[in-house]
Regions:
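N-terminal single-pass transmembrane signal-anchor helix
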Residues: 7-35
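Membrane-proximal N-terminal amphipathic helix
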Residues: 40-67
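Short, charged low-complexity linear motifs
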Residues: 15-25, 44-53, 77
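Residues at secondary-structure transition points
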Residues: 9, 38-45, 49, 101, ...
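N-terminal secretory signal peptides that target proteins for export/translocation
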Residues: 1-7
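Helix-centric, low-specificity signal for extended rod-like, repetitive segments
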Residues: 1, 34-37, 41, 50-53, ...
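Periplasmic/extracellular, small/polar-rich flexible segments of pilin-like filament-forming proteins
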Residues: 2, 60-140
């Protein structure tokens, strides 16, 4: 009897375990949406940076050739003609393309794909005049 009394308080009761699991589940339910928002914001930043890089490459090409180009692989140094998967083919969240190009201007866009397609900012667009457009005004 003495041994049973000694070991009776060494474990957790089922109620204590259930309360702990409930607290962890509530914390996870609150934290997960916030985490996903942060992930989407990070992907948006990657898309904007890719568009700015494309605009920079177009400006460099224009300064050398006095015309803009739509040839992403030949003239701008990308691996393929487009669309370019952003950030890469294994983690594909945006498609980078030149949607319009002439001797005097260009328009490029980063369109969301896959899990990023539900993002409220939608497609990012930039042109040779550095006009930046997105679905919401606070996205750029």
């Amino acid at each position: 009897m003495n041994i049973q009394a000694k070991y009776r308080h060494l474990g957790f009761t089922l109620i204590e375990l259930l309360i702990t699991v409930l607290i962890v589940a509530i914390l996870a339910a609150v934290a997960y949406p916030s985490y996903m928002d942060s992930v989407q914001k990070s992907r948006r930043t990657t898309a904007r940076n890719a568009l700015l890089d494309l605009a920079s490459r177009e400006a460099k090409f224009y300064s050398t050739n006095n015309t803009f180009t739509s040839s992403m692989n030949t003239d701008l140094g990308y691996a393929s003609a487009g669309p370019i998967a952003i950030p890469d083919a294994t983690s594909h969240y945006y498609d980078l393309t030149i949607t319009a190009s002439s001797a005097t201007g260009f328009t490029a866009q980063a369109a969301p794909v896959g899990p990023q397609a539900t993002d409220g900012c939608g497609t990012y667009t930039i042109d040779n005049l550095n006009s930046k457009v997105a679905a919401q005004s606070n996205c750029w």
